């Protein structure tokens, strides 16, 4: 069992052990609202995810990773800044208009390490645009991502759900299309596809071409084309963000037809719960009937299958290109969603379906395929990529929070974390060590023994008070340390 020692010693060990040579390229593939139990590599026999599964076969799979925020904006902005939601006071999507000016981000740190940084796809980062001059909203968002977040090149959209609202309102209010509200919307308008997009709206399925016109197919094509033309001497960090499998689940029909009620996973029945679950854990109760859950899951699984195809297009390009042996591929979701389990749909809760980000890191040249059971945090990726990039110990120590995953990836040195992952929604936090999850609800504290209750239905706090007390202490210490350290303001310089 790995013992835990200081981060400084870990960095020394890794620096001595790694081979000399140019640092690798780094490709992030981030998807939206993906629940790990719908992937074959996480045990779903019914799944149609061969491309992600293949990536897992060649990579390191983190069985017990957790996200820090349980909605898109909190999770993504926590990751890019290495700050927790409580540091940012960001628990729900609309809590914060923008991050503090000049905030630290790991892409800015990668730029200082000589990386070319590229953003492609859906954007839920909220950079501060104060003082930035731009000709239209797209230009402003692009420049803010470049200046405040640390990206040299940007192609981004707000995502399908926001886009429908933007396009509908603009056409209804203005009567004609004004370019510059959203880059993907402009693409649809220029190619006479906007009317089709808006007529379909939230309906199912989409008739747009899946690989060139549908949002994620278009993002994938953009990413591949940028890589195909990449001739820079410096290594690249590319962050590709898919909108799928986020609602409204409008994947092309051939993907949804793959699924029937026979191959649906069983629903975790809320009647199995032995305690009154606090309302904070059930923000969106399931409406209507079991049929609602079936239709919801069928469309969701179709969106996942479509997402998998786009992941495959991207990884196939990498594997058949000059980048094959020198690119680290990191696959993950910002969080998962509830699909009827515990009587809940959606997110913003602390059940495992939402908290596991399906984290996979593949770099066969250096990291042997394996499964890691140590609990880690998605926020750990900040220090991890800087470690992979060969950044100095001082640079890595300046990262506000988290621990490098490199010692787990290459089995050299010792992991600096304590094997506990922390997550938060407004007013409620959880501590998870792989075997147990403690939820620090002010009125109803909860302890799940995941060894005997993987579905999280039985509160065993009274039966195992010592375990609960231990995780409560760890949670309080984490909150104190992450809140009191002066570097946690996020305003430290790069």
PLM-predicted stretches and their roles:
Residues 4-13:
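Sec-dependent N-terminal signal peptides
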Residues 484-494:
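Short, charged, surface-exposed hinge/linker loops at domain edges
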Residues 7, 402-405, 483-485:
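Compositionally biased regions
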Residues 2, 16-439, 455-473:
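Formylglycine-dependent sulfatase
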Residues 476-479:
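A short N-terminal helical cap/helix-turn-helix that marks the beginning
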Residues 447-448:
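Short hydrophobic beta-strand that contains or immediately precedes a catalytic carboxylate
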């Amino acid at each position: 069992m790995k013992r835990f020692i200081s981060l400084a010693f870990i960095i020394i060990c890794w620096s001595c052990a790694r081979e000399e040579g140019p640092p690798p390229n780094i490709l992030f593939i981030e998807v939206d609202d993906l629940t790990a139990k719908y992937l074959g590599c996480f045990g779903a026999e019914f799944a149609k995810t061969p491309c992600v599964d293949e990536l897992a076969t060649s990579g390191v799979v983190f069985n017990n990773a957790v996200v820090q925020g349980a909605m898109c904006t909190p999770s993504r902005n926590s990751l890019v800044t290495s700050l927790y939601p409580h540091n940012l006071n960001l628990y729900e999507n609309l809590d914060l208009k923008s991050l503090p000016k000049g905030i630290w981000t790991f892409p800015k740190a990668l730029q200082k390490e000589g990386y070319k940084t590229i953003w492609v796809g859906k954007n839920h980062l909220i950079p501060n645009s104060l003082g930035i001059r731009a000709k239209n909203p797209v230009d402003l968002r692009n420049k803010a991502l470049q200046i405040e977040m640390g990206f040299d090149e940007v192609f981004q959209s707000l995502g399908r759900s926001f886009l429908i609202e933007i396009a509908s309102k603009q056409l209804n209010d203005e009567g004609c299309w004004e370019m510059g509200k959203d880059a993907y919307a402009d693409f649809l308008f220029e190619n006479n596809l906007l009317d089709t997009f808006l007529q379909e709206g939230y309906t199912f399925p989409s008739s747009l071409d899946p690989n060139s016109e549908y949002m994620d197919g278009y993002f994938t094509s953009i990413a591949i084309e940028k890589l195909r033309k990449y001739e820079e001497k410096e290594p690249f960090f590319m962050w590709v963000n898919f909108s799928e499998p986020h609602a409204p689940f409008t994947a092309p029909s051939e993907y949804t037809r793959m699924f029937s009620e026979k191959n649906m996973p069983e629903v975790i029945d809320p009647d199995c719960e032995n305690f009154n679950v606090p309302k904070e854990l059930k923000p969106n109760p399931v409406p209507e009937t079991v049929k609602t859950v079936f239709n919801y899951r069928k469309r969701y699984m179709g969106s996942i299958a479509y997402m998998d195809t786009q992941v495959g297009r991207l990884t196939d390009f990498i594997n058949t290109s000059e980048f094959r042996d020198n690119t680290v591929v990191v696959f993950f979701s910002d969080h998962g969603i509830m699909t009827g389990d515990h009587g809940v749909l959606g997110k913003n809760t602390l059940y495992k379906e939402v908290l596991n980000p399906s984290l996979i890191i593949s770099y066969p040249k250096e990291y042997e395929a394996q499964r890691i059971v140590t609990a880690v945090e998605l926020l750990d990726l900040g220090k991890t990529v800087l470690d992979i990039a060969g950044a100095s110990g001082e640079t890595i120590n300046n990262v506000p929070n988290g621990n490098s995953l490199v010692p787990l990836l290459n089995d050299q040195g010792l992991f600096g974390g304590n094997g506990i992952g922390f997550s938060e929604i407004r007013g409620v936090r959880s501590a998870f060590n792989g075997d147990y999850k403690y939820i620090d609800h002010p009125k109803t504290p909860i302890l799940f023994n995941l060894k005997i209750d993987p579905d999280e239905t039985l509160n065993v706090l009274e039966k195992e008070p010592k375990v609960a007390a231990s995780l409560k202490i760890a949670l309080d210490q984490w909150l104190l340390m992450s809140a009191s350290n002066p570097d946690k303001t996020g305003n430290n310089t790069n």
